Amino acid sequence: MIQMQSRLSVADNSGARELQCIKVLGGSHRRYAGIGDVIKVSVKDAMPRGRVKKGDVYNALIVRTKKGVRRRDGSVLRFDGNAAVLLNSKLEPIGTRVFGPVARELRSEKFMKIISLAPEVL
């Protein structure tokens, strides 16, 4: 459950360390975003020689949330923190690696690249 001003960690090797949500995409009055949703983020902390700089604005795909996601069988998949993968304007991942597990809910036509890069799909 990510909303404006939420801070997220980064789950790829794009060079960013911390992100801040500045807009939840998908409707003018949409308040929350969950796993599999695309948000607009600002880079708040970056590595010195990374691909991205502090202050840059990107799209990001949420891959882990503390709130979790409810499955059809009634189980709930929760993670220890909120994490996202940075995307370019064509919704392709900026990084070449994804760290940590990701949810199976990302398995759509648009985000199969992130599923294939992830070490574990839950």
Curated annotation (Swiss-Prot):
Entry keyword set: Ribonucleoprotein, Ribosomal protein, RNA-binding, rRNA-binding
GO molecular function, one term: structural constituent of ribosome
Pfam families: Ribosomal_L14
Any Gene Ontology biological process: translation
UniProt cross-references to InterPro entries, sorted A to Z: Ribosomal_uL14, Ribosomal_uL14_bac-type, Ribosomal_uL14_CS, Ribosomal_uL14_sf
Coiled-coil segments: none
The keyword Ribonucleoprotein is annotated on this UniProt entry: yes
GO CC list: cytosolic large ribosomal subunit
Domain of life: Bacteria
Protein function: Binds to 23S rRNA. Forms part of two intersubunit bridges in the 70S ribosome.
Subunit structure, interactors included: Part of the 50S ribosomal subunit. Forms a cluster with proteins L3 and L19. In the 70S ribosome, L14 and L19 interact and together make contacts with the 16S rRNA in bridges B5 and B8.
Family (UniProt): Belongs to the universal ribosomal protein uL14 family.
NCBIfam families attached to this UniProt entry: rplN_bact
Protein's recorded name: Large ribosomal subunit protein uL14
Species, as recorded: Dichelobacter nodosus (strain VCS1703A)
Gene name for this UniProt entry: rplN
